């Protein structure tokens, strides 16, 4: 018998989650306008799950979906509700409800052990960022420009202007001010890092984890390096 043309498999993906703190659509719209304006290209067609856990009243689910898609996000579904009737209603309206997985301590230990083994198996397949060659750009990167270092680290000897974008599959070094968007580890390198002499970025991202400017207040205007710790972005001041 010939092999089937399709196969279903379980896997996991990193999705952006939009946490709603109000059911007022006008307020949600106003805040989305501000957020998307900071990095419109980055958010274009990004898959989004809407978390309704913090809402203390009902909301127009169809209106929320329409609003999300108006800003060119790809709407995936809702999450966060512990109310069975609410989840039932969401599904009856034709929307997906995405369950989050809660893992107890013993399970976490077992998963961590498996993760260490799995990581050791794929190390040879994915080169460390320090094995990459460097792509060097000399001079300022101006608004509207995009520089991509495919399978390389990116070294910018100059500043990255607001509205500009630098992308690398490895690390990003900016010997100047970083005012635009910096996306490191673009192909999935969780050990990628971002270095700059003056942090004033619109957005920074490593392996799909990102911060917008308001998340960088601690080291704003300072020389920093940004990296992932336990899948969370962390910034440290350079001495």
UniProtKB/Swiss-Prot annotation:
Protein name: Probable septum site-determining protein MinC
Keyword field contains Iron: no
HAMAP family: MinC (MF_00267)
The protein's assembly and partners: Interacts with MinD and FtsZ.
Family: Belongs to the MinC family.
General function of this protein: Cell division inhibitor that blocks the formation of polar Z ring septums. Rapidly oscillates between the poles of the cell to destabilize FtsZ filaments that have formed before they mature into polar Z rings. Prevents FtsZ polymerization.
Pfam families with a match to the protein in the record: MinC_C (PF03775), MinC_N (PF05209)
One example of a Gene Ontology biological process annotation: division septum assembly
Domain of life: Bacteria
PANTHER family associated with the record: SEPTUM SITE-DETERMINING PROTEIN MINC
Keywords: Cell cycle, Cell division, Septation
SUPFAM superfamilies: Cell-division inhibitor MinC, C-terminal domain
Annotated source species: Colwellia psychrerythraea (strain 34H / ATCC BAA-681)
Keyword flag Cell cycle: yes
């Amino acid at each position: 018998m010939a092999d089937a043309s399709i196969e279903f498999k379980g896997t996991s993906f990193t999705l952006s989650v939009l946490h709603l703190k109000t059911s007022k659509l006008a307020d949600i719209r106003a805040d989305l306008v501000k957020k998307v304006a900071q990095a419109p290209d980055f958010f274009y067609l990004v898959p989004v799950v809407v978390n309704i856990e913090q809402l203390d009243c009902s909301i127009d689910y169809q209106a929320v979906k329409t609003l999300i898609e108006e800003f060119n996000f790809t709407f995936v579904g809702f999450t966060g509700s512990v109310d069975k009737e609410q989840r039932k209603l969401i599904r009856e309206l034709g929307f997906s409800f995405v369950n989050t997985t809660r893992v107890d301590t013993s399970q976490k230990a077992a998963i961590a052990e498996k993760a260490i083994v799995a990581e050791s198996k794929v190390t040879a397949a994915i080169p460390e960022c320090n094995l990459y060659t460097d792509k060097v750009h000399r001079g300022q990167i101006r608004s509207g420009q995009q520089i991509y270092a495919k399978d390389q680290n990116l070294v910018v000897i100059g500043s990255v202007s607001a509205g500009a974008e630098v992308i690398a599959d490895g690390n990003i070094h900016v010997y100047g001010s970083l005012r635009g968007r910096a996306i490191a580890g673009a192909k999935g390198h969780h050990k990628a890092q971002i270095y700059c002499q003056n942090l004033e970025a619109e957005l920074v991202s490593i392996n799909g984890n990102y911060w917008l400017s308001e998340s960088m207040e601690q080291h704003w205007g300072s020389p920093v390096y940004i990296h992932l710790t336990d899948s969370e972005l962390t910034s440290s001041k350079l001495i």
